[in-house]
Design a protein with these regions (language model features):
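Intrinsically disordered, low-complexity sequence elements enriched in Ser/Thr/Gly/Pro
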Residues: 10-11, 186
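C-terminal motif of bacterial Sec signal peptides marking the signal peptidase cleavage site
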Residues: 26-29
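Sec-dependent N-terminal signal peptides
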Residues: 14-23
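Extended amphipathic alpha-helical interaction segments
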Residues: 84-91, 95, 100-224
Length: 224
C-alpha cells in the first residue's frame, strides 16, 4: 500500500512539474511581449495630473481650459482604477498574460483568456489552498467589477467624443494667430503643441481605461 501511495505522490509531482514546464514554455516566447505590455501599463498608470496651459490669446486659452478640464475629469478615473487593482497584481498579471497570448499566438481575446485560464487552473490543482492563484485573480476581478464597468464604459465613450471635439478645435487654433508677429506666433504654436500633447494623453488614458473595463466584462464568465 505504501508503495502505491509513493507511486501516486511521485506521479502528482511529475504532473506538477509537467504543468510548470507547459506554462513556462507557453510564456517563454511571450517574455518580451509581457515586458512591453507591463511597461505600457505602468506608463499610463503613472500619468500625472494635468497642468493648466495659459495663453494671452483668448482662442488658445479657451481651448487650453477645455483640455485641462477634460484631462482633470479623466485622471481621477485612472486613479480610481489603480486604487482598486493595485493590491491585486495576480489579476493584472493574468490580464497582461492574456494580452501577450493574443499578440504572440494570434488568438482572439476569448480564446486567449480561455487558454491562460486553463493553465492557471491546471497549476492550481495541486497547490495548497493558501497558494492557489485563481482565487486571488478573482479577488482582483471583483475589485475592478465593483467600479461598475458598464457605467464606466458609457462615461468613457462620452469623454472620447468630447476629446475629439476639443482636438478639432485645437487643430483650428493656428488661424487665431496667423497675423501676429513672428515671436508671438512661435509662442502660440508652442502653447498649441502643449494642448495637443495634453489631449493625446487624455486619449491614451481613456483608451487604457476603456480596454481595462471591457476586459473586466469579458472576464466575468470565468468569475461566476
Amino acid at each position: 500500500m505504501r508503495e502505491k501511495e509513493k507511486e501516486e505522490q511521485k506521479m502528482k509531482k511529475l504532473m506538477m512539474v509537467a504543468g510548470a514546464v507547459a506554462l513556462a514554455g507557453m510564456f517563454a516566447g511571450c517574455a518580451s511581449t509581457r515586458e512591453v505590455v507591463q511597461k505600457e501599463y505602468e506608463r499610463v498608470i503613472a500619468l500625472p495630473p494635468a497642468e493648466r496651459i495659459h495663453s494671452p490669446n483668448k482662442a488658445v486659452d479657451d481651448v487650453a481650459r477645455l483640455s485641462f478640464d477634460l484631462y482633470n475629469f479623466c485622471h481621477p478615473l485612472l486613479k480610481e482604477y489603480e486604487a482598486a487593482t493595485t493590491n491585486h497584481r495576480e489579476y493584472t498579471g493574468f490580464m497582461n498574460d492574456v494580452q501577450c497570448v493574443m499578440k504572440d499566438e494570434g488568438l482572439g481575446e476569448e480564446d486567449a483568456m480561455a487558454k491562460v485560464y486553463a493553465l492557471v487552473q491546471g497549476e492550481d490543482k495541486d497547490r495548497p489552498d493558501a497558494e492557489k492563484v485563481w482565487p486571488r485573480i478573482k479577488e482582483g476581478w471583483a475589485a475592478a467589477n465593483a467600479l461598475n464597468p458598464a457605467k464606466k464604459l458609457a462615461e468613457i465613450a462620452r469623454l472620447v467624443v468630447r476629446n475629439q471635439e476639443i482636438s478639432e478645435s485645437a487643430a483650428k487654433l493656428p488661424d487665431s494667430f496667423k497675423d501676429g508677429d513672428f515671436q508671438s506666433k512661435l509662442q502660440r504654436a508652442a502653447e498649441v503643441d502643449k494642448i495637443t500633447d495634453q489631449l493625446t494623453q487624455s486619449a491614451e488614458l481613456l483608451a487604457f481605461l476603456g480596454e481595462q473595463y471591457r476586459k473586466v466584462q469579458v472576464n466575468k464568465f470565468y468569475n461566476k
